């Protein structure tokens, strides 16, 4: 059974239809990168997947837990208790870190497992320190977010998401708010998670990274999945003209900035 499955998701903001029947299925241990132009629907799809937005129509499930079914052409969401269970199955790392500024690094990582999952504090703190060490943040447990670089803050955000022991981890442009010099350290962390077969969906504009780390690449544009396949197929032999145009534009922009 798939860890995550969205079928025929539609979402409009007023008269603007942002998602036009998007379907995505992610298997355990799979790394899926979502690429595409700004305004193409990537972040909206991620927000619908993680219950930050509701779909107008379509279905959403995490394993056996159904978050939304479809009735009479509309999405009908599960009750509060069922959705709380669904939320325990995924983690989300935003582009803007969203750390609590008045909490130490350790408390940022430990807060949700203790307060939401009601886990033992000593056990959670020991796991959190091990996570921080693994992510290259040794000795930062008592620091506050303002004392960290952007790359360090994003790694704390990743540790916070992992501390909840999710079955799947979503990333929304995890490096877009970082100085280019700090981007590499965050990408290395995500790559290490991929090497450990963490199930992940990554919305990214980092094409070389998407190519290197992904099992599957999905090109989303105009609210629809235009093309998907292996990194080799999508980047080296795209089948759709829109995909070819997007990659050509990306390469031209990258060359101009080099």
Locations of regions flagged by a protein language model:
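Short coil-to-helix segment of the ABC ATPase nucleotide-binding domain corresponding to the Q-loop/switch region
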Residues: 103-111
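A short, proline-enriched helix->beta-strand linker immediately N-terminal to the Walker B motif
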Residues: 163-167
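Catalytic Walker B motif of ABC-type/P-loop ATPase nucleotide-binding domains
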Residues: 169-172
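ABC ATPase "signature
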Residues: 228-229
């Amino acid at each position: 059974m798939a860890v995550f499955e969205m079928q025929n998701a539609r979402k409009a903001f007023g008269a603007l239809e942002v998602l036009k029947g998007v379907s995505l299925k992610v298997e355990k241990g799979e790394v899926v990168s979502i690429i595409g132009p700004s305004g193409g629907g990537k972040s909206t799809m991620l927000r619908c997947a993680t219950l930050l937005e509701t779909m107008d129509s379509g279905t959403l499930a995490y394993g056996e837990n159904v978050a939304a079914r479809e009735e009479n052409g509309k999405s009908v969401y599960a009750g509060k208790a069922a959705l709380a269970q669904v939320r325990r199955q995924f983690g989300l790392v935003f582009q803007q870190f969203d750390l609590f500024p008045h909490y130490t690094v350790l408390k940022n990582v430990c807060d949700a497992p203790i307060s939401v999952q009601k886990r033992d504090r000593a056990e959670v703190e020991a796991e959190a320190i091990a996570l921080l060490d693994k992510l290259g943040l040794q000795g930062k447990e008592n620091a506050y977010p303002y004392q960290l670089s952007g790359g360090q803050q994003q790694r704390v955000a990743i540790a916070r998401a992992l501390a909840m022991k999710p079955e799947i981890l979503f990333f929304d442009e995890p490096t877009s708010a970082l100085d280019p010099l700090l981007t590499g350290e965050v990408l290395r962390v995500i790559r290490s998670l991929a090497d450990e077969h963490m199930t992940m969906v990554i919305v990214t504009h980092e094409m070389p990274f998407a190519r290197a780390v992904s099992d599957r690449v999905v090109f989303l544009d105009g609210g629809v999945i235009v093309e998907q396949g292996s990194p080799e197929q999508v980047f080296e032999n795209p089948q759709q003209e829109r995909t070819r145009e997007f990659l050509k534009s990306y390469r031209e922009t990258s060359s101009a900035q080099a």
